[in-house]
Swiss-Prot record:
Disulphide bridges: none
Database matches in SMART domains: EFP, Elong-fact-P_C
Domain of life: Bacteria
Species name: Ureaplasma parvum serovar 3 (strain ATCC 700970)
Gene (name only): efp
Pfam families: EFP, EFP_N, Elong-fact-P_C
Pathway the protein contributes to: Protein biosynthesis; polypeptide chain elongation
Main location: cytoplasm
Protein name stated in the entry: Elongation factor P
Molecular function as annotated in GO: translation elongation factor activity
Length: 188
């Protein structure tokens, strides 16, 4: 029996069925005004297409989607998608670029991910809360810039650009938060 959840109870990471699609909540907000039903706005990812949209769900009752997750490691890019290998069975699967629109910015060789499936259908991957990545290129630090928390631009192999502290150099490994793509700290 499918579990029904109220829209107001949705949180980041929850998955649900809505209008024939499977969505995963990225962010949500709930506004309750007097004499009215609460308004739930969710930034969601369509797990079939990879599209990210905003859905307004006021008083909706939604069917929770039960997603199966299995740990896999990124092996290589086959030209049409990314190939992941199950560490236990050595099974390999290819996931099209379209299903990894955001995640592809942070996946490097050897990255461990959770591959998501719904009723046997491949839905994409879920990244860990923090990832260790390699800086391919970083701008030079500006001499004399003593502003607290001064940053500069840096790039990953995927061409993802983000801000890092002035002391980070090309070739260094850093920790990022893949949910927003921001620098967290130096890798040890």
């Amino acid at each position: 029996m499918a579990t029904i959840i109220q829209a107001k109870d949705l949180r980041a990471g929850h998955t649900f069925l809505y209008k024939g699609n499977i969505y995963q909540v990225i962010e949500n907000s709930f506004n309750k005004t007097a004499m009215r039903e609460g308004i739930v706005k969710c930034k969601v990812k369509n797990l079939r297409t990879g599209a990210i949209t905003i859905e307004v769900l006021t008083g909706e009752k939604l069917e929770q989607a039960v997603i199966e997750k299995s740990k896999m490691t990124f092996s290589y890019d086959d030209g049409s998608g990314y190939v992941f290998m199950d560490n236990d069975t050595y099974e390999q699967i290819s996931i099209p670029y379209s299903q990894l629109s955001w995640e592809k910015n942070f996946i490097e060789e050897g990255t461990e991910v959770s591959v998501m499936r719904y009723d046997g259908e491949l839905m994409g991957v879920s990244l860990p809360d923090q990832l260790v990545v390699t800086i391919i290129e970083a701008e030079e630090a500006v001499q004399g810039n003593s502003v607290q928390n001064a940053t500069k631009r840096a790039w990953l192999e995927s061409k993802w650009e983000f801000q890092v502290p002035q002391f980070i150099k090309s070739g260094e490994k850093v920790i990022i938060n893949p949910s927003n793509g921001q620098y967290v700290g130096r890798a040890k």
